[in-house]
Amino acid sequence: MMIDNNCGKEKVWVPNPEKGWINGDLIKEIPGEGWLVRDENGKEIKIEKDELRMQNPVIQEGIDDMTSLSHLHEAAVIHNLIKRYEINSIYTYTGSILIAINPYTKLPIYSKEMIESFCDQPVSKLAPHVYSIAESAYREMLNFQKNQSILVSGESGAGKTETTKFLLQYFAAMGEKGNGVNTSLISEEDIVEGNNIETQVIKSTPILEAFGNSKTLRNDNSSRFGKFIEIHFDKIKGTIVGAKLETYLLEKSRIVKPPENERGYHIFYQLIKGFNNSCCLKNSSNNNKDEDSSSSSNNNIDDLKSLLKCKASDFNYLISSGCDSIDGVDDSQVFIKTENALKVMGLSNDELIGIYKILLSILHIGNIEFEKGKEEDSSIIKYGNSSFGESFSDDDAGGYNPLEISCKLLGCSVDSLKSTFCSRKMKAGNESYTINHTVEQASQARDSLSMFLYSRLFDWLVVRINQSIDKIGTEKKDNSFLFIGILDIYGFESFESNSYEQFTINYANEKLQNQFNHQIFKLEQLEYEKEKIDWSYIEFSDNQECIDLIEKKPLGILSILDEESQFPKSTPSTLCTKLYNNHSKSKNFEKPRFSQTHFIIDHYAGKVEYDTNLFLEKNKDFIISEQVSALESSNWKFLTNLFQILSKKMNGGGGTSGGGGAGGNKASSSAAGKSTFKFTSVSSQFKESLNSLMTTINSTNPHYIRCIKPNTEKRANLFDNVMVLHQLRCSGVIEQLRISRSGYPSRLVYDNFIKRYKLIVAKDFKNDDDSNESKEWNSILKETDLNSSNGGTNNQIELKRKGAELMINKLSIDISSVQFGLTKLFFKSGIIANLELLRSQTMINSATFIQKIWRGYTDRKAYTSTKHSSIYFQSLIRSYLQQLEYNSMVEENSAIHLQSLIRTNELEKQFNQLLSTTIHFQSLLRRLEDSKEFNTLMDRIKKIVKIQSLWRSNLAKKQLKLLKAEAKSLTNVVAEKNKLASKLGDIQSKLDMESQLAQKIKNENEQLSSQFSNIQIEKEKLQKDFGNINLEKEELLLKYSALESEYHQYKQQNELIISKLKQHINDLEEKQHQHSYKNNEVVGNTSFEGSTTTNNGVTSPPKSSPASPIRNSINSNSDTTISGSSDDSIDNTDSLILSPKQHKGEDRKRNHEISSISPPRSRETIGHDDDDNNVDVIPRRQFNELEKEYKELKQMDETHKQYIESLKLQITQLEEKVKKSSSHPRSLLPGIPSNINDSPKVVYTKSSITNDNSSSHHQQQQQQHNISPSNSITSTTSPINMMDSNIKSLSYKDFTNSQEIDAQQQLHQYHLNNGTNPATSTTNGSGNPLSQSSPTGSDKHIQQSTISDLVSALNFNNCQLESGKYLVDLIIKNHDSIVSKYVPSEMGGIPEPAFILSRCFLKNIYDVDATVIGTPNSTNSGGGSGTGVLDPIETNVNILIYFCDKVEEVIYRDPKSNCSALCYWFSNFYTLFNIMETYNQDTKDQLSLNDQDKALIEKLKITLQTMIVKAHKNVVKNITDYIQPILHKSLNDTTSEIDFMDPITNYLNQIQISLSLENCYINNNLCKLLFEQLFSFINAMIFNEILLRKDLCCLRSSIPIKMNISELEHWVKLHHGKEWSSSVCDKLRLLKEVVYILMIDKTQLQNDELRDEICPTLSIAQLKQLLTMYSPDVDSFEDPIPLEILTSLMDSPKYNPDENILLDLSKIFTLKFINSNQTLSSSTSSENDLMATINLNALESVQYACDDLVSNIVKKNIEIVSLNNQKSIKK
């Protein structure tokens, strides 16, 4: 298959003088003349074959590296840049060069998220950007340990300065990352400010802009000097350790004479307009208040104030150009920024004032005017009638005198400076004489002084900046650091009129271009050598001849210029004559036809004609020694120091070349010799500094950025083709393309080449299946399909190379146009374009063939369908016709049949009529015959009947006669009568019997009805009685409950009174015995049994009468658990701590236990229960007993009252004893708390009860006689019984054992321990008491210390502060083992430290009745000695703050702390914060706090918030430090598919972040917040990577990303089936939309409705960036994204060009405190992030075992008390 380089009708580029290049169509080839082309206007043009410029394939439009273009020429480059500029893609690669087009608008592509995305990424994967060049330089510096340089060039207004700023911004961020700062998680406000090195490097830019930039016609902020910034980095860490700045060729002529419609340097205008806002004025006002302030400094400020009441129009230097402002720029505001930058650099107020005074003196020097003197060729200073200084004339009665003002500002003599303007001294041998200056020469001397002052000020500023940012020093440069140099210098310039500045600029660019050419050629060589291909014949263009023309000695242009500059009578003509004579034969030098003062140099970018009229003047840098001497003799210290610093710098060899005046400094101090004018050539200085710069650059690895100015109007979205093309030529881009084009610019790896173009040769190999070549191709094709990556083993690469060779042979490509490298194919320019055309044509042909096959298939299918339809239709027609014929036949047969039926009917009718007539006639005949026969028969019968009647008559008559005879006989009559009477009697008897039986049945029925009515009445009565009984039962129960509650109320009141009385007694006894004891511990227990009499004669209340059976049964059951007044029974018991559920509602359950106990029921009751659904009816007798018991309780209350009266009497007796007695009886020691009888609950566990009834009865008796409830209560509340004469030492165990638990609570505990129901376990089914079976043996009672005991232990001996801190230390000391400890509660597990601290300290802060009793030996510090009363709020707040500080010190600062531990402590602080907030809400109306207490509580709240923020940051840092590298590694690993799900989920499973937080239910919001933030972080990271990386923004990468996202969502829902799982997964919605877009047809996105449906979250700007970065896979048949889609998106009203397309990672991990006025971090969207509901009652009911803590705290308190007592004894 032979490739024709111009096959088909192709597009070409046609030259156009206005647009540069326009579209054209290739028509035909004209032999011997070239090609005939038709342009877009329809005009036909002939183009030579060598000048023909082919267009590239559509797939290569807008590509980001123009060396990948198939046709590499100017037209293709311009077209590609235009296409990219239209979609705001301002950066484009040309090989290693980055082309940056000024957009003239702000683009959101320089954010910190963009910096983070470019960090540590290969340049090939990222879109072109200035950050990619910075990243490449930074990584190469660290990886290869070699210095780097970045050369930024371009003409004025192209954006060089802004590009340099972005480079510095990136390097500053990299320096921060080297210091361990995660820049992705800090906001813009958190970026480091101040005087660190990164900030100082960045702040040097506005200073240099103010003093070295000015407004020009081309640029409002044009740099008028070149600069080279070295950023010094640490070799290992990559942190910024310093910087150094060098400047080149300051344009000094702009100081005294700015070009028309341009400005001088910005600082002059900023000073005039912004000095009133200067910080110097504010500082001076503050200094005026200080008595020791310097008066001279204030005088300087006053002078400046008066002199700066002026305008720009008051100064000659500022008004001469006719421009003094910039549109859209406020010089006063810029001045503030400049001054702030100077302050950052470390300049003091005096130095700032000195700068302002020099600037102002320069302006006033410019106002000095001259006029002719009396002598010939002389001049004098013009006084009065000055054209300038109108603002100063009114203030001075003598008129405005600029010379005097300048001298006053500079601190030098007016006479010494005045003489230097109007005359100069000359020496001839030993004689000297004075020569007068003309007016013109005097003006030159004046301007020379101004330029000298400004250039030295500029040089001094550079020195001061270097002193500030050069932290290491030049002496360690070669060993201690690496550097990246940034060169910001003019680009090549070629105007209509080119002067000395353009000559020096172009000379510098020639040198840089020479270095650039060598570098590009070197890179090409390295690439070819790496791939082992032949490159020796590649041509290389060298501009060394042009450089030699300019600088080579002795006849170079610079040498001739310096020579002519030293001759007094030299002119531009003489200069040009020498140039013509020496260089007329040079190919790079030309003489213009019509000018004797111009010459032409053929530079690399084109020919430039220079005008020499100002060459000689601008090359001279005259320094008048008298002026220098006058300045050095100034009495102003700042000015003299300035010259001294510069002199030392110059003599030390480290001077800057700024201003080109460095050489003058060396001679200025010793200028008393030969001439007062010291000649210094600007060109020689520049050449020297340029050579030094080139030496530095050549020692580095250079990178290139070419800034392009798109138009002269400074408008956005305007592209001037011709202007851009000119800049590309001048910047060396076209030359670089020529170098690339001369070699093999198109390069493809073998794998990509085979995948993309295999379809072109597939048909050829298929047609020859049996050949060896085809078999080999098939095997290679399978191998390349199996190995999709670009790499592989050497055998695989060799196999792919063979496949590429087979393809090249099949494609018939000229072997001279192809080179086979080790891993790549190298093609000459145009080959790839032709391959793309062939691929496109093959795809079109294939599509056509597929369409043909498809159309054939569809047509055949349609024909077959039509044929079948036709046959079917014909059959239907035939069927229809046959149906018609059949119907006709049916009708005919039917007609015949009908006719036959009709005829049959007619004949039948006739037959029937005849038949009926015949029959009728026959019947008439028969009737007639029968009638005759009947009549005969009737006559015969009549005769027979008559005979018979006569016979019967005779017989009747005979019978009558016989009857009459019988009637006459009486006997027969009587017998008959009797017979009838007897029959009647029988019947009557039967009737009587039946009547009696009926009456009996009736009576029985009536009796049964009556009985039934009685039963109904009785039933109703019984039901009514039963209801009344139930009501009565309920009333009695209510009455009993009321009586019992009233009893408890009386009981509590009495206990309160007794407690107060006991306290009063204790106080009196302590006063009486206050110095009778030296020990602090009391040993021994006091038993409280029955009514006893103490040594003091106090009698306890008498025993109450025996309780009721119910009470006895309760006491008998509880006796087994209560019997614990002795130590032995307590020590031998088992331990079982009550759970929170057991404690909850104990009082309510105990009250229910009494009411649930019922007596034995009678047999009648049981039987009645069986009849009526077993309804239990309690007898009234039981309630009578309850009433009786209540009366007994009332009697007990009366007894208590008597006991109180006895106590009062005892108090009176004790008071009398205190007054009379000189000795003091023993009392309780201060170590026993005052609330000893309100001690914490002691929890007892499993106790056994025997089944023996006698044992139970014995216990009942013992309960009745010894441990009645009243006696028990009374005994425990009496402190008098504790005052035994043998008191020794009171330990904490004795202290807790002296406490007693209520009987009802013990009964409830008994039921809980034995697993029985208190409501049903008392009685069995028969009403007998139920005895629980248990193992036989002695009862055991073991006591464990709970949280209440810990609270009491902390109060023990009033050492709460020290013991509290000791408790915190105990908790923190074992933090590794405490991580997994959670206290069970109704709210789930509560972290142990938070639970303990909230119960022990936080609760005390909000306890309304909380008081801390201070003993005479207590102190404010919580110790056991001293005086005063402790503030409970202050003490508890201090302990909690101590806890926070301790956790931060031990946990947060420990680098070994893992995420699980951090989450645990995060949960602790979160729980404490929520408990505190709940206390605040519950007690806000009850607490009355003073201002000090409120401040303490607020301080604690802020501390907890701060700790939550710190904990959150530590957790986030731990998570992100692990997950971020996983994501980076997964997305950057080219050897395997993207897989970040498994490492992330494995990590989360290992640290168990969810379990560490979810053990406590109140952490649900916290856990949700962390997971949402984590998934948002993953979403943002991957989303930002996709938007900026070409290798991820494709279909091939979207599939594994989608799979990972789906698996991650599945993991969350599977492991965390919470209601917030969906909200967590929803954080990935933006990423899911992006992945979906990558997998669908992108043309759908042009439709607004479809776009809103596909990606509702994605913004238009983000979508445009996504489509811009998208590129089809190598072997994909998908077309590139049409630029029309991108432009349509940019035209959408929703498109915001200023939008930051990347997601801000720093705003993800934030917290919000709703109920706080403190703003500790930026808020999130959810208002419930840190709020949870806390049930304080449930929390306070939890009893938690803490024996070790209690024992340790008690020991600590005893140690504290002992230590304090020892101290007091010593005192």
Swiss-Prot record:
One Gene Ontology term of the molecular function aspect: microfilament motor activity
Composition-biased stretches (Low complexity): 1112-1139, 1253-1281
Coiled coil: 1180-1224
Biased composition (Basic and acidic residues): 1143-1153
Domain Myosin motor: 61-840
Domain IQ residue range list: 843-872, 866-895, 940-969
Keyword match Repeat: yes
Region annotated Actin-binding, chain positions: 690-712
Compositional bias (Polar residues): 1077-1111
One protein family per Pfam: DIL
Keyword Lipid biosynthesis attributed: no
Origin superkingdom: Eukaryota
Dilute domain: residues covered: 1427-1695
Residues bound to ATP: G154, E155, S156, G157, A158, G159, K160, T161
Complexes and interactors: Myosin I heavy chain is single-headed. Dimer of a heavy and a light chain. Inability to self-assemble into filaments.
Family label: Belongs to the TRAFAC class myosin-kinesin ATPase superfamily. Myosin family.
Annotated function: Myosin is a protein that binds to actin and has ATPase activity that is activated by actin.
Name of the protein this chain belongs to: Myosin-H heavy chain
Organism listed in the record: Dictyostelium discoideum
Gene symbol of the encoding locus: myoH
